[in-house]
Design a protein with these regions (language model features):
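RNase H-like, Mg2+-dependent phosphodiesterase core
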Residues: 2-336
Length: 336
């Protein structure tokens, strides 16, 4: 009897092997009841409300509300159990129907390093076609805050090597950053607005050079209510429909920009750690403060300008200086 020819698996779309979502308390309880009824084995995970292991599948629901489903059976479980029986929403595999704008040719902009004591602020602009966005979603490209540094580096290489993509970043070494921060009136948002406009302008030029056209619009992960980037683009003579909204990283092209920005930031942190002989942590909490004290102790307070954002309160503290008094917050009126 002739053996059935094996179907070429390369022709089949790759199934999703990981899915992350937020569940409210009622949904989390419903999911737990389903897993218990299925006889799945529970196991311990740090910071998890519960975790269960099934055939080819692990499900971990964290106390924060985040639920992570991983393993070969992820896609089938999400489509045939989680969505119909727990969330009541069909999302997986319906990205294009639910968010058609994701698959239009457009630019995405995001930044990294804004809240970190050490290392630069990095602006990134990525311009992609709908086909690129589809491919990136399948590869797991999402907001960089949900990814490890190792995964970010891997996805950064994939994004940059995608044929036809335009990728531009803007950042400067720390001494120059501190100089520009002062020049922009010690207003980080104004400086970031200029950086994003620069990245966007350069990416538009690159994309046009490759494709003889420009995308019709772009999306910025909103960092201020003021249209600072749009104003900078206008000042540069660049006409472009740049939209902005919070949590824009759900858009795959903005997510790609967030990954590119984070990868560049991590590379710079690693370089600075090597230069200073001190492992410089991310963030601006106690670990960063201790690293700053060690750095200043070894190389002197004047060296901090080459490693840290001097306007951070922690940067004053590690040099034994009194931080300047905070200015009272005044909300500006929106333009009519």
């Amino acid at each position: 009897m002739a053996r059935k020819a094996k179907q070429d698996s390369d022709d089949e779309p790759k199934k999703v092997a990981m899915h992350t979502l937020k569940l409210d308390s009622a949904q989390a309880a419903k999911l737990r009841a389903i897993l218990v009824a299925k006889g799945w084995v529970s196991f311990a995970v740090d910071h998890a409300a519960y975790a269960f292991k099934g055939e080819n599948l692990n499900i971990v629901h964290y106390k924060s509300g985040k639920c992570v489903i991983s393993g070969k059976g992820t896609e089938d479980f999400v489509k045939f159990t989680l969505e119909p029986d727990v969330t009541g929403q069909a999302v997986l595999g319906y990205e294009e129907a639910n968010n058609p704008e994701w698959f239009e040719e457009h630019a995405g902009l995001d930044e990294s390093g804004k809240g970190d004591l050490f290392g630069p602020v990095v602006s990134a602009c990525v311009i992609a076609t709908g086909e690129m966005a589809r491919e990136w979603i399948e590869l797991g490209i999402k907001d960089s805050k949900k990814l490890t540094d190792t995964k970010i580096a891997e996805l950064d290489r994939i994004i940059r090597s995608t044929p036809g993509v335009a990728v531009k970043t803007t950042f400067m070494r720390m001494a120059k950053y501190n100089e520009l921060h002062s020049r922009f009136g010690k207003n980080l948002n104004r400086l970031l607005g200029w950086m994003h406009a620069t990245s966007c302008e350069e990416a538009l030029k690159d994309f046009e050079l490759q494709h003889q056209r420009r995308p019709k619009w772009g999306l910025l992960d909103q960092f201020t209510e003021e249209p600072l980037v749009q104003k900078e683009l206008a000042r540069k003579g660049v006409e472009f429909d740049l939209r902005m909204r919070t949590k824009a990283e759900s858009d795959p092209v903005v997510a790609a920009a967030s990954i590119v920005a984070r990868a560049a930031f991590v590379r710079e942190i690693d370089r600075l750690s090597q230069d200073g002989g001190v492992q410089l942590p991310k963030g601006s909490g106690s670990e960063a403060k201790n690293a700053g004290i060690e750095l200043v102790g070894r190389l002197g307070p004047a060296i901090l300008v080459n490693f840290a954002k001097l306007h951070f309160k922690t940067a004053y503290e590690v040099r034994g200086l009194e931080p300047p008094a905070s200015k009272p917050f005044v909300r500006r009126k929106k333009a009519e």
